[in-house]
Every structure is written in structure tokens, then in C-alpha cells.
Regions:
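A short beta-strand motif that forms part of the nucleic acid-binding face
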Residues: 78-80, 90, 165
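Alpha-helical and coiled-coil interaction segments, frequently adjacent to or embedded
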Residues: 1-38
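Unchanged
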Residues: 92-177
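Acidic, metal-coordinating catalytic segment for phosphate/diphosphate chemistry
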Residues: 28-62
Length: 177
């Protein structure tokens, strides 16, 4: 099992596939909504949803990062969208979407210690990725099949933006986030 994530290892031990585990997590998510139904439909379609090779729709994973006392929320000012938002990014072939969310928070904020509050989904949504230029090439509009996890980090820990993606990173009160 070397090289497998904790969740993949647990799924293998329990005799379930990672896809089945993700479907079960999405199925348990409440409130039920049309995005949930569409995510389940696409998972059943046997499309490659974990890489950007699927130009129409692919998985992204995000994180709502809170302080241990829940008085602050970490946000990044994303250059592409010209707005403050929660942190996250593309799965890029990784089927462990919690690991993707953790990786993206570390990359986009400079935090070295961040931990899941729970392995359950915090939210799920289908987001439209507008057409844009990336690395000198045009990327057509597409769908981000996004799952969000609730993570926790210490607001006293050093943070810094990832200059190619965001210009600022900061902690906000939940009301301001």
C-alpha cells in the first residue's frame, strides 16, 4: 500500500473503491441539491473527472480554513477571479480530494501545518471556470466539480501568497469572509 493515501488505504482495507467512498460521501451530503445529483451522475459516467484532460468538467477540491476557536477564516485574493475566495485547486489526477485540499492550502497560503476538522464534505458545488489564458494558451470555459473540506490552522503561523495565483492571503472574521 506504499504511495496510497490514508483514505485510499482505508477504502482498500474495507473492500471499497475510492470512487465508491467518494460517491457515499456525496450521497450523505445534506442538503440535497441539483449539484449533488449532477456530481453523482458524472461519477457514474466513467468520464475522467480527476484530470484537466477532461476539458468540459473535472474535480477541484477546496478548503474553508478556520482558526481553532472558529473566530477567523483564511482567504486568498485570487488573481484570476480578481476577488477574495477560499483556497483550493485542481485534483490533477489525485483521487484523494481531501489530500488535494490540504496540498492547495499549503501551496496557496504558505501554511505548513493545517489539519482536517473532519473527513466529511463541508460543501459541494459546481462552479463555472471562465475561459482564460494560462501559460500562453487559451483554456475554454468549463465546470469545476468542487468539494470543500473544513480545515483548521493557527492564525499566528506565518502565511504568504503564492505569487502566480494570488496576491494576498489573510485571516478574516467569519462575518467579513
Amino acid at each position: 500500500d506504499k504511495g496510497k493515501s490514508y483514505i485510499e488505504h482505508q477504502a482498500t482495507q474495507n473492500g471499497t473503491s475510492y470512487k465508491a467512498k467518494l460517491k457515499a460521501a456525496i450521497d450523505r451530503f445534506l442538503p440535497a441539491c441539483s449539484d449533488l445529483e449532477e456530481l453523482l451522475r458524472r461519477l457514474d459516467s466513467h468520464e475522467d473527472l480527476y484530470t484537466r484532460a477532461n476539458a468540459a468538467a473535472h474535480f477541484t477540491a477546496s478548503a474553508w480554513v478556520v482558526s481553532p476557536d472558529r473566530s477567523q477564516v483564511l482567504m486568498a485574493y485570487h488573481k484570476l477571479y480578481d476577488s477574495w475566495a477560499w483556497l483550493g485547486g485542481h485534483a490533477d489526477g489525485d483521487r484523494d480530494l481531501l489530500a488535494v485540499a490540504l496540498r492547495e492550502v499549503r501551496e496557496e497560503s504558505g501554511l505548513t501545518e493545517v489539519r482536517p476538522v473532519s473527513e466529511d464534505l463541508y460543501s459541494l458545488e459546481i462552479l463555472t471556470g471562465a475561459g482564460h489564458e494560462k501559460h500562453g494558451r487559451y483554456v475554454s470555459s468549463h465546470l469545476h466539480l468542487n468539494v470543500t473540506y473544513l480545515l483548521e490552522a493557527d492564525p499566528a503561523a506565518p502565511i504568504c501568497p503564492k505569487p502566480d495565483e494570488n496576491s494576498r492571503v489573510g485571516w478574516f472574521s467569519p462575518e467579513d469572509a
